[in-house]
C-alpha cells in the first residue's frame, strides 16, 4: 500500500494530478483546494490514501494529514463515497467542516453540489462526536465551547457577521474573542464590537 508520494507535479485534470516520482507518473485524485496549491514542475510531498478495487488501484492525495483524516472521516457517513468526500473538501477546509458540524450548520453542506438536506443532516449528526478527535487546529478546538461560554446566541451572530462580509472562520474567531472578554454582552453589542474590531487582534 502506498502511504506517501514525493515528487514533481506534472499535468493536472479536473480532479487529479500526475506526480512524477523518479520518472514514474502516479495519477493521484485530490480535492480542488489541494489542486489549486500545486504548481507544475514543483516538488511536493503528498499523503496518500490507497483504495484497491478488483480492477483498479486509486490513489487519493493530500498536502496535510488533517485533510486525509477528514477524507476518511467523511466517508464514515452513510451515503458519502470518495468522490463526494473530495467534493466536500474542495469546498470546505477541515476547520470549516468542524465549525459547521459543531454549530449544527446544515446549510453550509447543502450549498455543495450533490449534498441534499438529508445527507447534510446525516453529516452533522454522524460527525458530531468525531470531528474533535482528529482535528489538529487548536484555534478551532478552543472555539468549540463557544455555546457554553455565554447565553448569547452565537449562531445568530455568526450568520449576521457572515452576511456582513466576514468569512466563517473570521466570524468564529471574533465571536470567541469578544465573548471571552465580555461574557454578558448582548447580541447587538457583540455585532457592533465585531465590526469595530474586524482588523484587530482577534484576526492576528
Swiss-Prot record:
Region listing for Domain III, in residue ranges: 153-204
Superkingdom: Bacteria
SUPFAM superfamilies assigned to the protein according to its UniProt record, in alphabetical order: DNA helicase RuvA subunit, C-terminal domain, Nucleic acid-binding proteins, RuvA domain 2-like
GO cellular component, one term: Holliday junction resolvase complex
Subunit text: Homotetramer. Forms an RuvA(8)-RuvB(12)-Holliday junction (HJ) complex. HJ DNA is sandwiched between 2 RuvA tetramers; dsDNA enters through RuvA and exits via RuvB. An RuvB hexamer assembles on each DNA strand where it exits the tetramer. Each RuvB hexamer is contacted by two RuvA subunits (via domain III) on 2 adjacent RuvB subunits; this complex drives branch migration. In the full resolvosome a probable DNA-RuvA(4)-RuvB(12)-RuvC(2) complex forms which resolves the HJ.
Family: Belongs to the RuvA family.
NCBIfam families linked to this entry: ruvA
Protein name in UniProt: Holliday junction branch migration complex subunit RuvA
